[in-house]
Amino acid sequence: MPTESASCSTARQTKQKRKSHSLSIRRTNSSEQERTGLPRDMLEGQDSKLPSSVRSTLLELFGQIEREFENLYIENLELRREIDTLNERLAAEGQAIDGAELSKGQLKTKASHSTSQLSQKLKTTYKASTSKIVSSFKTTTSRAACQLVKEYIGHRDGIWDVSVAKTQPVVLGTASADHTALLWSIETGKCLVKYAGHVGSVNSIKFHPSEQLALTASGDQTAHIWRYAVQLPTPQPVADTSISGEDEVECSDKDEPDLDGDVSSDCPTIRVPLTSLKSHQGVVIASDWLVGGKQAVTASWDRTANLYDVETSELVHSLTGHDQELTHCCTHPTQRLVVTSSRDTTFRLWDFRDPSIHSVNVFQGHTDTVTSAVFTVGDNVVSGSDDRTVKVWDLKNMRSPIATIRTDSAINRINVCVGQKIIALPHDNRQVRLFDMSGVRLARLPRSSRQGHRRMVCCSAWSEDHPVCNLFTCGFDRQAIGWNINIPALLQEK
């Protein structure tokens, strides 16, 4: 996560780069001599030690390569038209596609000794990609109701984290790369409080288990504890924007709404924390409260996690052992246990139940960055990774996972529904999927030109008992979304 907020111009450049994923080659009907005229002039204008025969052969090869790539470019366009036609036909039949985004990352070719071999390689890759798309169609008949209820729009940069307060009044918290954290009314979507005490990206937000306190971690190498007081506005009737969790219409960048308005400018602003936790030598990427709320843990890019006393701000333990930057930390809801995730492909379980000594266990099962690991109420830990898998672990048997979920995109900060044990997976490819602890897919949240995330989804958070929204997601489209998931219907159709 960046320590500084990304500018709007950077976002536009990123959008333009994504649109320009096709190979762009100037087309011409000129003769062979005209086609190679420009490179010839350029070479002749330079002091070259190459013999004229070698230069002539080289220029001829350039011309052949240009013609070959021009043909491949035309084939590329035709194949994309066929894929678009197939998608439209399937959408009309009510089917959905998992991971049907054909990006330039899927088109991987190696240099070959001849242009004809390169052509064959590209054709084979495109056929494989098309076959993958077709084979990924799901025949499941699940039509669980997944309603988009409310969009929370007000941040001026991507949102890294989302969390729900555990005390009354229940509010939603978001942490953003725009250096602020915002508190929202869940029912109305109105911004209630802005916290502007950090001078770097706010990377996480967590609420105290029993008081109106928030804990935020930042790229400014600190974590802040601050108190808030809010009064909820009168809720307005919620429009029904339901759509089946399995139906989807692909959206394009031009459908993205204008989010430049700063609704948080009217919010009461807090600029000074109650407590600032300072011991890290790098970005503080995540933080959480230990059970009871008297201690807090932070995770940093300096490869350590720190345990603090909240009242005194003193460092109690510095947890070392990870070989690379930490990405996340999470505490157990009822026991003094902490789990930390890292780019070193592992996550570690730290046990503080015995005050005199703390033990650590290392979980090795992923092949890429572990983006998050979270506890369930029982004896399980669920981990998500950039290797596109989610693994469920038993704390009593750490040798191998008891379930593995394989997906088509990197997974960010996951969250588990405590009562029903449903895992919400936010993906890099803008999707959000729901799985049970056995690895069975239950639903995919709707995403279309009218609703859903339009950029990477960074985090998910359940709030089971809330009558309006019981699942929240946030992403780098600068918005958080509140969903109503019909969990009984979801489990009934499993």
Curated annotation (Swiss-Prot):
Basic and acidic residues bias spans: 32-47
Compositional bias (Polar residues): 1-13, 22-31
Effect of T125I: In NOCGUS; no effect on interaction with PACS1 and PACS2; does not affect homodimerization
Gene Ontology cellular-component annotations: cytoplasm; nucleus
UniProt-annotated stretches for the region Disordered: 1-50, 237-265
Listed Acidic residues bias regions: 245-263
Effect of S129C: In NOCGUS; no effect on interaction with PACS1 and PACS2; does not affect homodimerization
Gene3D superfamilies: YVTN repeat-like/Quinoprotein amine dehydrogenase (2.130.10.10)
Alphabetic keyword roster: Cytoplasm, Disease variant, Nucleus, Repeat, WD repeat
Effect of mutating D260N: In NOCGUS; no effect on interaction with PACS1 and PACS2; does not affect homodimerization; does not affect subcellular location to cytoplasm
WD repeat boundaries on the chain: 154-194, 197-236, 279-318, 321-360, 365-403, 406-445, 452-493
A GO biological-process term: lymphocyte homeostasis
Compartments where located: Cytoplasm; Nucleus
CDD domains named among the record's database cross-references: WD40
Chief location bin: cytoplasm
InterPro entries hit by this protein: G-protein_beta_WD-40_rep, WD40/YVTN_repeat-like_dom_sf, WD40_repeat_CS, WD40_repeat_dom_sf, WD40_rpt
Subunit structure: Forms homodimers. Interacts with PACS1. Interacts with PACS2.
UniProt function note: Required for normal ER Ca2+ handling in lymphocytes. Together with PACS1, it plays an essential role in stabilizing peripheral lymphocyte populations.
Associated clinical condition: Neurooculocardiogenitourinary syndrome: An autosomal dominant multisystem disorder characterized by significant neurological impairment with structural brain defects and seizures, poor feeding, poor postnatal growth, ocular anomalies, dysmorphic facial features, and variable skeletal, cardiac and genitourinary defects. Death in infancy may occur.
Protein name: WD repeat-containing protein 37
Higher taxonomy: Eukaryota, Metazoa, Chordata, Craniata, Vertebrata
Gene that specifies this protein: WDR37
